[in-house]
Amino acid sequence: MVLKKRSDKNSFNNRTPTGVPGFDLLCEGGLYRNSINAVLGGPGSGKTTFLLQFLYNGVTLYNENGLYLSFESHDEDIFLDAINYGWDFQKLVNDGKIRIIRFSPKTSIEDIRKQIEKVIINHNIKRICIDPVSILSIRLENELLIREILYDLTTALKRMNITTILADETPEGGVDSFSLGGDEVRSRAVKFLCDGLINFYSSGIGGETDRAVRITKMRRTNHKRGPVPFKITDKGIVVNSK
């Protein structure tokens, strides 16, 4: 289903296209430019593939440099995941088109923010993926403090004209739930701050209806409601938007 655009203010110029086949048709041409978006789903649902595809397409299709911020995966793991779909991240890193930074979970939010801002300026970054976002607040239990810290980070990214995707897992069986690391305090904070919420589902039973994506929130966007089936092919995610 192709959605009808509402006005010129939602034109392509105000969008950051993901380049994921079929997905951008669900949300008026892509993510709202300079927005903060969360991609949620269980293990194996397609979150990491979506992030890598977003960054790869940013460079190869739209000439936008990207930053992958990780707290778990090593560079080599990311290269191996990407090359399965024909995406040569190692070459893009060598060419300075994509940067990968791996932080320790003990790194302070302030140090993370400073390093991100430095990379953005030095490498003309336009797209950022953070995986997983729960690590940013895992040591905090006070909701107001979590909101303050995440607000400072996301505000800085918006100020620097960055379109950001945060990724994390939903609990087992939590089809419509939003949970980061199983902690509802952090969940509410991130849910409040994000402009877009995108859920990936996988039943694990196989077949045409095994996987679906659902945009549950996207500000300033007349997005498709309800789950839409997708496949993970040898070239990445393909959404059935018809």
Where are the model-predicted features located?
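Conserved P-loop NTPase
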Residues: 1-8, 12-14, 105, 122-124, ...
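Conserved phosphate/pyrophosphate-binding and hydrolysis machinery centered on Walker-type P-loop NTPases
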Residues: 13-17, 45-48, 68-71, 143-144, ...
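Pre-Walker A adenine-sensing motif
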Residues: 18-30
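Conserved RecA-like P-loop NTPase ATPase core
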Residues: 23, 39, 66, 131, ...
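Conserved P-loop
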Residues: 33-38, 42-110
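P-loop NTPase motor core
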Residues: 37, 110-192, 197, 207
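Conserved nucleotide-binding/hydrolysis micro-motifs of P-loop NTPases
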Residues: 72-76, 104-109, 134-135, 164, ...
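Mobile, glycine- and charge-enriched loop segments
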Residues: 77-106, 116, 121-123, 137, ...
